[in-house]
Design a protein with these regions (language model features):
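A short LG(V/I)-centered, amphipathic sequence patch enriched
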Residues: 45-63
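Alpha-helical linker/hinge and terminal dimerization helices associated
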Residues: 47-48, 68-90, 95-96
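Central regulatory/effector-binding core of bacterial HTH transcription factors
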Residues: 92-153
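Secondary-structure junction motif
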Residues: 188, 192-222
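Hydrophobic hinge/microswitch elements
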Residues: 217-268
Length: 308
């Protein structure tokens, strides 16, 4: 049996309740009575046959409500897109995108520039962890995200972008101070004492880098997790600067270290790179704006990432 469809008023009301946190605040924003808000939500839950909102403070969507919220936000986006097309010149639209800091620092900004200059589409960029990005895509708060996993998020399409290549590197003065005679005579104890820089406490890529370094040093696998002095720098440019200035060793995107290899101002701690595939997850809706954004992102990735 097919359920009856929600109206535009239903979807607008639902999104407003989530955005403002309470029925009263949503009523004020929409200029209707709180009882009208309550009645619309009640009708929606009757149509769905499920509870869509948790009556907490602030109000939050249930799992079923997350799907409704995504549709509500997509509906609002498509209405704005229609207005933009009808208005013609002078209209613009904003697209919310989550990505990692390294992508923004090395290749994604070209897509942002082209969208703003050529298409009058403006990006609301957010640095989010991949798990949180997935939740925000499901709820419709984000329209797209750069991810390192290909698993399709409900309501979204996924496109392969390319491979981001990183190198384990350090400055020569850092090597002289902490890892003299590196590779030939360096011990695990010396490596454990050598400071490392990480982006934040959710940054686990250094573990993969450490494995490659120990393989090059021909060290036997460690039975215990290794812990080095760690400096946390949640900024891609400042993270790179810390490596350049010999503060710590770190994992840098190829774009941030290629010139330094040519001038011998960075040393590789491993002969093998660390590589991550990147994917473009975006709402699965028929939208000229999102199609344009996807095209610009793919163009930027073509020059900024490896093809395989």
């Amino acid at each position: 049996m097919l359920m009856k469809r929600f109206t535009t008023d239903h979807l607008t009301t639902f999104a407003a309740v989530i955005e403002h946190g309470t029925f009263d605040a949503a009523a004020e924003a929409l200029r209707v009575s709180p009882s009208a808000i309550s009645q619309r939500i009640k009708v929606m839950e009757q149509l769905a046959g499920k509870v869509l909102l948790r009556r907490t403070n602030p109000v939050t969507p249930t799992q079923a409500g997350q799907s409704v919220l995504r549709i509500a936000r997509q509906s609002e986006f498509l209405q704005l897109e229609l207005e933009r097309e009808l208005v013609g010149e002078g209209g613009f639209q904003t697209v919310s995108i989550a990505l990692n800091a390294d992508s923004l620092a090395t290749w994604f900004l070209e897509a942002v520039r082209m969208l703003a200059h050529e298409d009058e589409i403006f990006c609301d960029l957010r640095r989010e962890g991949e798990f949180h990005s997935s939740a925000l895509l499901r709820s419709g708060e984000l329209m797209a995200a750069i991810t390192s996993r290909p698993g399709k998020i409900p309501g979204c399409s996924v496109d392969y972008l390319g491979v981001a290549r990183y190198w384990c590197v350090a400055a020569p003065e850092y090597m002289s101070r902490y890892l003299p005679g590196f590779s030939s005579t360096t011990t695990r104890e010396e490596l454990n004492r050598a400071p490392v820089v990480e982006y934040d406490r959710k940054d686990f890529v250094q573990e993969a880098a450490r494995v490659l370094i120990e393989e090059d040093m021909k060290l036997p696998p460690s039975l215990e997790p290794e812990q080095s002095p760690t400096i946390y720098i949640p900024s891609s440019p400042d993270y790179a600067r810390a490596v350049y200035e010999g503060v710590a060793w770190g994992l840098l995107p190829q774009a941030q270290c290629s010139e330094h290899f040519a001038t011998n101002t960075l040393v590789k701690l491993s002969t093998k790179p660390v590589e991550f595939p990147l994917y473009w997850q975006h709402w699965n809706i028929n939208s000229p704006v999102l199609e344009t954004v996807s095209r610009r992102v793919a163009e930027a990735a073509k020059t900024g990432l490896l093809s395989s």
